[in-house]
Amino acid sequence: MKVQSFDALYDEDSLMQKASRQEFSKYVDHIGTEGMQARSGLLQERQYPHLNALVDELMRQNPRLNDSLKERLELLRTGEAQVVITGQQTGIFGGPMYAVYKLLTCLKVARQTEELLNRPVLPIFWLATEDHDFDEINHLIVPTHDFRTRKLAIQAPDSISRSVSRLAFDQTAVKDIVRQALCTERETPYTKELLALSDRLIESSTTYGEFFASFMGELVDHDIIFFDADTEAVRQLEIPFFERLIQDNAEIRQALSKGIQETTELPDTFLNEEAAHLFVEDIGRDLLYPGQDFVTKQGKTYTELELLALLYASPERFSNSVVTRPLMQDYLFPTLAYIGGPGEIAYWTRLRPLFHHFDWTMPVLIPRMGAVMLQARDEKGLRRHGLSLEQVLHTGVPLTPFDAAAIKRHLHDATLLGTVLVEEVTRIEQQELRTTAVATKLNKQLQLAVETIVDQKRRLHEQANRSDRALQYQLAPDHAPQERIHSILPWLNRYGLNLVQTLRMHYEQTEAEQLKIML
């Protein structure tokens, strides 16, 4: 493996480029090394009375943590340790590759920050199991025979909107998908090992969150702490802050509107200014809307007192929206930094006034690592076309349509020459008083020769185009970023289960955050 900096991965005005620059400080509270130090000092002044119980729950959720990380996690009980957090929906086999890149960034930032602050810094991966959009996590993308994208998806168990954590984990369907996905790949020395690992992890998992954490943990020797907020133990810890979110709901919505107004020049993100930004579980997971009382989309109403009573009786029925989850994260954990992609950074900037409402500052926002992986054959394909990787990512691999008419026009001169030959042969035949239809026979042979040449050229063209479509699929499938479409699964099949650990080693040795990875 060879890793190089690749700044052309994102546009110059992308938040993946801007968010690390000093000019971005007008949208955030802390930035850079000094910002991390300032944030750490402020966290020391805050109280986290629930940390002992939180560590117990983290230990329960992460039985396979390596010994070094377990020892450092114990230091969170007293607040000596602080944390760096990233998060993602729990897609099967890790979802898109950028989830792996988030995880690696979290590990790297935690290590660097630990050295900077001279205190334990823990990497936390927040599992978005509260999310109810099953279609976001239920699939892998694989290539079709002509290198278009195709979804291999698990059917939703029912039509009711439920948190992913509440859905039955379909072991049979997930096993079927991994086999279908690997059928699109060549068998390698790693295939059987990958299948055996997949089957073992699938059979030991009862939820999609568990499977995600088990699979991703295996890739980095269980050197990261996964956190599932949608458990009864965590909901008990969250009661005091849910109470604040209910009681201060009007002020929170006003703060969100202010945050949106202050960041109009940043990329747009849809954050619902009308919602209460809390979900309650009834028949399914339903978003609350404020009014004289709180109302669900299904029309069920709750007074503030009724919601508070329900909260204390059944906290497991409550969950956060995309707006309130970052606030709950800051309530639960002494959070130094959050690692996110461009969309997350865009909406986090809108939340600044909400943090200030609680007399907090925002964590440091750090763009995740971005990357594109190239195989040796991909580099050969680029050289064959005389293309740079940047050109392919921005404009794609040029595919020329097959033009049979043009080829036939090109062969026209040869056909004319053949016609003259036929006429001469015919004249000689007639002089010799032969009566066979030689001219007709020769003309047919000429036409057959033309069609044969056209067919041969068509096959060569299709072969070249197939190779070009394969190159496009590998680097920018359907003209989308590789990291947003590809799963890590086929790459593990090609290069082995140590691939991510090898990438981690190279990534932690470079200062670059946008990478070209040559395999």
UniProtKB/Swiss-Prot annotation:
Record-listed E.C. numbers: 6.-.-.-
GO MF assignments: ligase activity
Coiled coil: 51-71, 440-464
Residues that span the membrane, as ranges: none
InterPro entries per UniProt: Bacillithiol_biosynth_BshC (IPR011199), CC_BshC (IPR055399), Rossmann-like_BshC (IPR055398)
General function of this protein: Involved in bacillithiol (BSH) biosynthesis. May catalyze the last step of the pathway, the addition of cysteine to glucosamine malate (GlcN-Mal) to generate BSH.
Name under which the protein is recorded: Putative cysteine ligase BshC
Organism for this UniProt entry: Exiguobacterium sibiricum (strain DSM 17290 / CCUG 55495 / CIP 109462 / JCM 13490 / 255-15)
